[in-house]
Amino acid sequence: MAGSLPTAVLGRTNLEVTKLGFGAMEIRGGPRGRDITSAQAENILNAVLDSGINYIDTSIDYGQSEEFIGQFISSRRDEYFLASKCGCAVGAPVAPPGTRSPHVFTKENIVAGVEQSLRRMKTDYLDVVQFHSSPSKQMLEEHGAVEALADLQQQGKVRHLGMSGTLPNLPEQIDMGVFDVLQIPYSAMERPHETLISQAAKVGIGNVIRGGVAKGEPGQSGVPRPDPWKTFESAGLDELMDDGESPTDFLLRFTLSHPGMHTTIVGTLNPDH
């Protein structure tokens, strides 16, 4: 399935994933993302699979992303592992740019969200479903959220439970012992979770890295820093680049070098990338 691209086993899931995955947030469209046509979405999704990439990550609150996946590559479902998220309030209006979507971790909302994702993406199962927005252990237990996802797993609709985790809740999420996959932000410009990635890998958790190229080459829009170039240079990262290497290439190389990572998801609308 993985073609000639480098692969890794995603922890105890035993899924052999390409070390480069596709972050389908890039095809969400407006108002929270760049406008996109159906033709663009079809082109990039098929280019991703044609290149050999076999891990696609999306979410129920990524605009048109799930619908595009169902419309354009559901017929190629045996070529990729599909990960989505749960916890976003089903039926809530799209949150304006710069704000977060509401999250509800009740059993009813978890089930409704997964069922919606299955319909949208025209598939009978999801390889990974991750809790969105890094909820605390207390919040998950209060609403029976993990049990809801485990029930869906027993029904064959979800293969592996995951968490899109960040500090301060990431350590307890690792210790809970129920998550097969963690999605964690990490790059040369964002390293607070570095040791936790190693800790998760040691206990058999599969690590999916997001933000591995810091949401784009420094200097491009979307990097959450006032002056990304200044941040990149002040950290001395430009001095570590190989001859002819772009900042994006360096950031990706750095992320891929972490021994505890298994795949890093990167988004683009340009098939040449």
Model-derived segments and spans:
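N-terminal binding-site loop/beta-alpha segment at the start of enzyme catalytic domains
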Residues: 1-84
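Beta/alpha (TIM)-barrel catalytic core signal, keyed to glycine-rich beta->alpha loops juxtaposed to Asp/Glu
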Residues: 4-7, 133-273
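Conserved, mostly hydrophobic/aromatic
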Residues: 10, 22, 48, 56, ...
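Short, well-ordered coil/turn segments that N-cap beta-strands
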Residues: 15-20, 51-54, 77-80, 123-127, ...
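Non-cysteine beta-strand/loop elements that form the S-adenosyl-L-methionine
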Residues: 19, 23, 81-86, 128-129, ...
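Active-site mouth loops of central-metabolism enzymes
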Residues: 26-39, 96-111, 138, 237-242
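Short, acidic/polar
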Residues: 34-48, 103-122, 165-173, 247-252
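Active-site groove signature of glycoside hydrolases
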Residues: 116-137
